[in-house]
Amino acid sequence: MREVELIIIGGGPAGITAATEAARIGASVALIDENENLGGKVFGPTGNAIKGSVSDKIEKDIRSQLLKDFNRVRDKISVFLNTAVWDIVDQRIVSLYPTDGSDKQINRIKGAKLIISIGAFEKAIPFPGWTLPGVFSVGGLNTLVKKKILPGERFLLAGAGPLQLVLANHLINAGANLSAIVNAASLRDITASAFPLFASIDSLKLRSGFDYLRNIKRHNIPIYRSHIISKVYGTREVEKAEIVKIDRSWNPIRGTEKEISVDSVAYGFGLIPCTELTRLSGCKHIYDESRGYWRVELNERRETSVPGIFAAGDGLTIKGYSAAIAEGRVAALEACAQLDRVQRSEADRLLQPALRKLKRFNRFGQIMDAISRPRPGIFNILTDDTVVCRCEEVTMQDVISAVADGAADVNDIKRRTRLGMGHCQGRFCGQVINELMWRLTGVREQREVFTPRTPVKPVPFGCLAGE
């Protein structure tokens, strides 16, 4: 079993920055990422093959500089690509498996310190028809469009959050027919957030936001505010979508339904942190009502409740790549100070600029999360036959029956229905099961989360045998 001073899980902006900083200081580092290239979702090698905004161009420049700095010290870093982490033992030993089918010899790595920077995934709310071919997540469709792949002819965007604007502009610039943008946030919500948003955002993001809106207006794309997608129709694939106006609590208003002929729908409600590894490691988590998701508790130096385990990037809270870069630097400097690789006074001095930036980034993230956080009324669009857990094909009726039979909590629902036992390990259905149970029981109890289990992701039996 190989041993290093610092293990970094996740090779996005936070992980790359942390590895670069720690290696520059002189610590022995292992950097692990599931993908064949470093960079994560934003700075990955897919790039952007279409004409973009000023923001897209700046992202390319930042990515280039990030990788240039990393490559200067890469020979000092043990890099494991196409490698996933499926277990963390004794809070220091990381179990690995190859995602590319290769026969890699290293199954475990032990580290004195651990930085978890595995990013985030999209928040999805089920609706009738969401399993039809032609329904995409906002991020999933954006990845295709950036590669100049248009999987349809008439597109509709639905949900809430800033990713909508980004995808809308990529679709427009790729020459797609964007039929409409359906945004759950009301004009009142957006107006109320305007001043604090402007105060917390840098000029580049502000300029890009206005550029996006101008581009949408210039192409006469209709925007339906205070609306959600309520249903998708189709025999074998998406043929049309139904949208409906909502009130302040996102309850659908009957009689306001409108059908739009489309063959592709992208929707989502922002991002939520990936917490499976921090939960598996025993780190304390809290549910942040203002943000609408579980997050790991940590101190200013990004150390969790488990000494020696740090977290950075969107795996903490959603703030974007600039914040992820700053957090990777903070976590690495603190870890290296604890390893006696850098004097405490020097680490404290180097930390300050990043910590000051993070205060502003955090305010920006809080505002974006508040705008995109789903309100309770949206769950009224679910019908009995709506699929809640896609992996195990568990429907709303299955959940209703389990609660009627006495299911007491989310883990009881999981045992009775297999909800959350599929390939994604409850990453999507786990987002909504609390709300569904509360609606069925009429009792809003303490929010719960699925008990973390190993392996956190499906692994081959051969890998387990190798352990």
Feature roles, as predicted:
Residues 1-467:
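Residues forming the flavin
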